[in-house]
Each structure stands twice: as C-alpha cells, then as structure tokens.
Amino acid sequence: AVGADPVAAWGPATHIALGEAILGSLYLLPPAIQAILERFPLHFLYGSVAADISFAKKYVPEGRHCHNWEIGEEILTSAGSDRLTAVGYGYLAHLAADTIAHNVFVPRQLLLTSTTQALGHTYWEHRMDMHVGEGFLSLARHVVVDHDHSEADALFDDVLSRTVFRFQTNRRIFRGMIRFQGHERWQRVFGQVLANSRFDLP
C-alpha cells in the first residue's frame, strides 16, 4: 500500500512551504474547505507539521501509528470546531506530502546518488529544508513555538495512541528540535556538507 512512512518524510520547513502553497491556492479546493482554511490558516499550518511531533512511534499498537491514514481521518472527524477541522486538514496534507516523499522523491534521490546511502533519508530531508529556505523554517518555529495549540494538542492526545511520552512531552521535544535546526552552528555545519556535495536537487 502507498503510505506516508515517516522514515522518508519531509522536514518542518518543507511541510510549512507546502502548506503555504496550499493556502495560496485555495480556489482549487471545495468551497467548504476553502472557507475554513481562509479563517484558520495558522491552525492548518500547525496540523501540517503536527504529525511529526510524536516520537517513539514504533511502540504504538498496530494500526494506531500517527502516520496512518485512518488516524488522520479520525483526527478530522473528531474535530469539534472549525479551528480543529483546519488542523485536521493540515494533518492530512502532511500525510499526502509524506506519501510523495516516501514513494517518489527520496527513493529517486537514493537511486541517483548511491554515495548518499549512508546518510539516506535524513540527508535528503534536510537538503529539501535548506532548499526551501530559512524563511519557512522560521515560520515553522513561529507556528509551533509562539502560539497556544493546547486545543489541538488535546485532540491529538485523545486520538493518537500513547508512545512512551505524552503528546505534551513530544511537543516540547519537537520544539527543541525545530529550535536546533535554526541554530547558527547547525546551519553552518550542514551548509559545509552541502558545499561539498556533488548532488543537486532536481
């Protein structure tokens, strides 16, 4: 089955960039969805990164993985407000984007650039995040760190199977990771890796 395997997923900056592209093309969506996303774009963007907040995913029961399509649909149907519905649509957009990453982009890059096999999926995830630009990583930090998403987090806590951490703990870890990605030293180190790379994005 075609799945949204998180092992080969996009990073937060890429998910935000894709989310912004959707928000810029709302005329393509059904009117009811368009109206909700127009009113709650921030909630949609939070949903578009939220699927990666849960850690230790391998410990959840079979079929309750946070990157499972049925889980995404359950989050959407469990939404009790238009704000949470926007979060649910963002969550599903995340899974759709990861499906492309897992089944098209990353396998192609690994096939074409066999010398990056050791670095694998994480390398290309960070390459794409660097490619979309610091502006989208800054926006990801703004969306996740600077706003109160307790209502959405409560929905995730209710729907998602517990890993070894509560969702609130997962969110604190994820916020730290996003801050780290924006750290000047990390960007300098990965920038040097890119400067020495023979491989370009298509």
Model segments located where?
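N-terminal leader/auxiliary helical segments
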Residues: A1-G90, A96-P202
